[in-house]
């Protein structure tokens, strides 16, 4: 096992512990709390994959951070902070929409790279809106926190979330997963739109019809889906 992988995990565990103390003292806002919960799941997955105990890793991580801070001068710290790009946290969903439990009548789950896609295949002939909470850096989507599909009535019918055991994903991973989710929902004659905020920072533009541009691979896949559906309908007639 690579030593840098282990030390990175140990430091992440300790920093999560520090952030948890901030929340316990009621000093964190809603996005801060949201990231804390998501990162907790990620750390558990990484700990299981690496075979490391989180409590023990936290103690070692504390020692690493204390050693670095002891060696770090105030001037160097100021320069580091000034040169680091700042990311923004954007929210399509409210805290209630983000934390609400939901259930699927006909569940389907698919893993697309480091992202997990869940769809309720029982949903038909609905208008569906995709909303997401994510961070942005340099005006581009950086990290997806959670994406959910909502009907006009407010029911959750689909979701895309990062896999805790596979931390880290690219903007292309997110766009591919959205394409899969759209295809799955449209299979049952649902009309799917993507929020303007998500379109802007994932694709760099927004369409009035709420549809992001699809990649050639996604277009071919959706064309095959349409042809298959037409053949199925003809056989039914």
Curated annotation (Swiss-Prot):
One of its GO terms (cellular component) is host cell cytoplasm. It is found in: Host nucleus; Host cytoplasm. The dsRNA-binding region is required for suppression of RNA silencing. This is Non-structural protein 1. Residues 205-237 are annotated as: Disordered. The gene is NS. Its main location: host cell. Residues 223-230 are annotated as: PABPN1-binding. Keywords: Eukaryotic host gene expression shutoff by virus, Host cytoplasm, Host gene expression shutoff by virus, Host mRNA suppression by virus, Host nucleus, Host-virus interaction, Inhibition of host innate immune response by virus, Inhibition of host interferon signaling pathway by virus, Inhibition of host PKR by virus, Inhibition of host pre-mRNA processing by virus, Inhibition of host RIG-I by virus, Inhibition of host RLR pathway by virus, Interferon antiviral system evasion, RNA-binding, Ubl conjugation, Viral immunoevasion.
């Amino acid at each position: 096992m690579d030593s840098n992988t282990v030390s990175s995990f140990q430091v992440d565990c300790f920093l999560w512990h520090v952030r948890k103390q901030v929340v316990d003292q009621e000093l964190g806002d809603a996005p801060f709390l949201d990231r804390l919960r998501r990162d907790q799941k990620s750390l558990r997955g990484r700990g299981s994959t690496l075979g490391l105990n989180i409590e023990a890793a936290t103690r070692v991580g504390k020692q690493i951070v204390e050693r670095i801070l002891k060696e770090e001068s105030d001037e160097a710290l100021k320069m580091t902070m000034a040169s680091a790009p700042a990311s923004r946290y954007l929210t399509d969903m409210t805290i209630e929409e983000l934390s609400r439990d939901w259930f699927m009548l006909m569940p389907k789950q698919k893993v697309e790279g480091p992202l997990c896609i869940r769809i309720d295949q029982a949903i038909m002939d609905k208008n569906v809106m995709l909303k997401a909470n994510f961070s942005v850096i340099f005006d581009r989507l950086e990290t997806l926190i959670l994406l959910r599909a909502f009907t006009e009535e407010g029911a959750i019918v689909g979701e895309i979330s990062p896999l805790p055991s596979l931390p880290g994903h690219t903007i292309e991973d997110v766009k591919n997963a959205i394409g899969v989710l759209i295809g799955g929902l449209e299979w049952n004659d649902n009309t799917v739109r993507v929020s303007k905020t998500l379109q802007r920072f994932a694709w760099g533009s927004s369409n009035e019809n709420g549809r992001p541009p699809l990649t050639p691979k996604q277009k071919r896949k959706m064309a095959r889906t349409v042809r298959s559906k037409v053949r199925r309908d003809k056989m039914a007639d």
